[in-house]
Amino acid sequence: AAVVMSGELADCFSTKSEGVAWITRTVREVFPEALFYGTDGRFHDSPVPALAAANWLASAAFLHERDPEGLLVDMGSTTTDIIPLASLSSLYGLTDLTRLQKGYLVYTGLLRTTIPAIVRSVSLGGLPTPVSAEQFSISADAHLVLGHIGEEDYSCDTPDRKGRDRTSCLRRLARVVCADLDEIGTGGALQVAQAFWDAQREVIHDAVARAMDESGASRIYTAGTGSMLLSSALGGTDLSVELGP
């Protein structure tokens, strides 16, 4: 088995090295011959620092063979990876910290991002309205009520441990502005959702534009759980359609 990992940063581990060692040991208990792909572009049979968060590089190395001048935008539940394939050789060895610093790791995703992580104020009835810095609602709520995902795609826990239906999502979105549906109605909650998506799309678009300008990439490919949404927003090729989920 060939393995990549991204769970070493979980707060149940004191350090990344501890997480890498635990994941490596646990996987090899089930698959004794497993090899682990690292950010150095090599396979390893023991825990080394390069194994931390190497999942993005495996996708990039695969796609680079198809189009070395492309840009891969991979949106997951929590983050969005922006990978300039033309610069692949310079990407080896990057950690999540350095990718954040370079703009290649954008910490916003299709499902788990809290609303105030992206948007600070929304317009309600034409009035600028600051949002509360609470975990009342997440990106999955916004994308569901906007029709970007269905209930079956809402695969993470809800902030209030309640339903994933449209009404439950609207209720959570209303709380973002310290209100409820009785106070701002469905229309107000939808304005919160739209403001979030507008801001999220802009953050990703700006990072993509910067990476394309720096790398000279000429084509965009999208992947991950948010691939269809991003291919429409960015005008890229949806790999989830072309290659399958």
Whereabouts are the PLM-identified features?
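Short, histidine-centered active-site or binding-site loop motifs used for metal coordination
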Residues: 5-9
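Helical "lid/coupling" subdomains associated with nucleotide-phosphate turnover
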Residues: 10-19, 26-38, 47-72, 81-245
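Active-site activation/catalytic loop segments of kinase-like enzymes and analogous catalytic loops
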Residues: 75
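Conserved Rossmann-like nucleotide-cofactor binding loop
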Residues: 78
